Design a protein with these regions (language model features):
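Metal-dependent amide/peptide-bond hydrolase catalytic core
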Residues: 2-145
C-alpha cells in the first residue's frame, strides 16, 4: 500500500530551511520504521527564498510612498514568505519584492480571497499606482548620486 504526503516549507533563512528538511526526513523515516514501513522522502525546490535587501528596502520606502501617496505604503509585517521566481534575480543582485494592494474598497484584506484562488477579484483602479511605483523607482534610482 502506497500513501503520499506533500506540503510546503517556507522559511526566512536558507540554513534554517536546510536544517528543517534534514529533521523532517529523519522524523518521517522514524515514524515509518515505528510502524514497520518504509518512506521515500524527496524535496522539490520550486523557488528560492525571496529576500528583500534591507538597504534597498529602506531606500525604496519613500519612493513607494511618493508614488502611492502618504500613508498608503504598508511594510510587510510580519514578513511574508512569497515563493517567486523573482528570488533567482535576488540571488544575483540586491532586489525588493513588493505587493500592490488591490483589495476592493470596503473589503477587509485579511479576509479577502488570496491571489491564485478562484475568488480573487482585484480592484483594477490600483493599476496606475503600480505603474507609477515602477516608473518612480526607475527614475529615482537613476537620479541617485
Amino acid at each position: 500500500l502506497f500513501r503520499s504526503l506533500s506540503g510546503t516549507l517556507r522559511t526566512f533563512d536558507i540554513a534554517e530551511r536546510d536544517d528543517l528538511v534534514k529533521r523532517a526526513e529523519a522524523a518521517i523515516d522514524h515514524v515509518a520504521a515505528a510502524y514497520g514501513a518504509t518512506a521515500d522522502f524527496s524535496i522539490k525546490q520550486n523557488a528560492a527564498l525571496t529576500y528583500n535587501d534591507p538597504a534597498l528596502s529602506t531606500w525604496l520606502a519613500p519612493v513607494l510612498e511618493e508614488a502611492a501617496g502618504a500613508g498608503n505604503v504598508n511594510p510587510a509585517s510580519p514578513p511574508t514568505t512569497v515563493a517567486e521566481d523573482f528570488s533567482y534575480f535576488q540571488g544575483q543582485i540586491p532586489g525588493v519584492f513588493y505587493h500592490l494592494g488591490g483589495t476592493k474598497i470596503g473589503e477587509d484584506p485579511a479576509t479577502a480571497a488570496p491571489n491564485h484562488s478562484p475568488g480573487f477579484d482585484v480592484d483594477e483602479s490600483v493599476l496606475p499606482v503600480g505603474v507609477r511605483a515602477h516608473v518612480m523607482t526607475a527614475i529615482r534610482f537613476l537620479q541617485r548620486p
